[in-house]
């Protein structure tokens, strides 16, 4: 019997995913993390990006906007700042938000506003990259 790992993805909005996986790929702060059953315990931050939950031939694509990742040998828990199924991303809305953030940054407002616009820009770029990957996989037109 193949080994699996329990996966829970939750955000302030509620539970996004609960199930088992053969492998989880998460956007860690220092780069992508590939997590298999019996992984060493780890607690790390997440950056905005694509979370892939692989079970057999099926892959579940989620988008997380930062958060905390806890890994135990038999369980992965994602406490996301916000999360959504990647297929639910509104590409036009993400592109408009990206352009608005770029405009705010170009306006050279104060340092706090610039940092907030930069964070928004990075989030929207990550959303658009997730949509692009889904398009390449044939999930989005």
From Swiss-Prot:
Main location: membrane
Keyword terms, alphabetized: ATP synthesis, Cell inner membrane, Cell membrane, CF(1), Hydrogen ion transport, Ion transport, Membrane, Transport
Function: Produces ATP from ADP in the presence of a proton gradient across the membrane.
NCBIfam families in UniProt: ATP_synt_epsi, PRK00571.1-4
One function term, GO molecular function aspect: proton-transporting ATP synthase activity, rotational mechanism
Gene designation: atpC
Name this polypeptide is given: ATP synthase epsilon chain
Subunit structure: F-type ATPases have 2 components, CF(1) - the catalytic core - and CF(0) - the membrane proton channel. CF(1) has five subunits: alpha(3), beta(3), gamma(1), delta(1), epsilon(1). CF(0) has three main subunits: a, b and c.
Family: Belongs to the ATPase epsilon chain family.
Membrane protein topology class: Peripheral membrane protein
GO cellular component, one term: plasma membrane
UniProt KW Transport keyword: yes
């Amino acid at each position: 019997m193949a080994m699996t790992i329990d996966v829970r993805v939750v955000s302030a909005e509620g539970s996004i995913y609960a199930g088992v996986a053969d492998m989880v790929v998460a956007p860690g702060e220092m780069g992508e993390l590939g997590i298999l059953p019996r992984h060493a315990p780890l607690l790390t931050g997440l950056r905005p990006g694509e979370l892939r939950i692989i079970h057999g031939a099926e892959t579940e694509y989620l988008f997380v906007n930062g958060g905390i990742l806890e890994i135990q040998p038999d369980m992965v828990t994602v406490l996301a700042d916000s999360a959504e199924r990647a297929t639910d991303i509104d590409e036009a809305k993400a592109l408009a938000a990206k352009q608005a953030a770029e405009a705010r940054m170009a306006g050279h407002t104060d340092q706090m506003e610039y940092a907030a616009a930069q964070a928004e820009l990075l989030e929207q770029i990550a959303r658009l990259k997730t949509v692009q990957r889904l398009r390449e996989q044939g999930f989005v037109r």
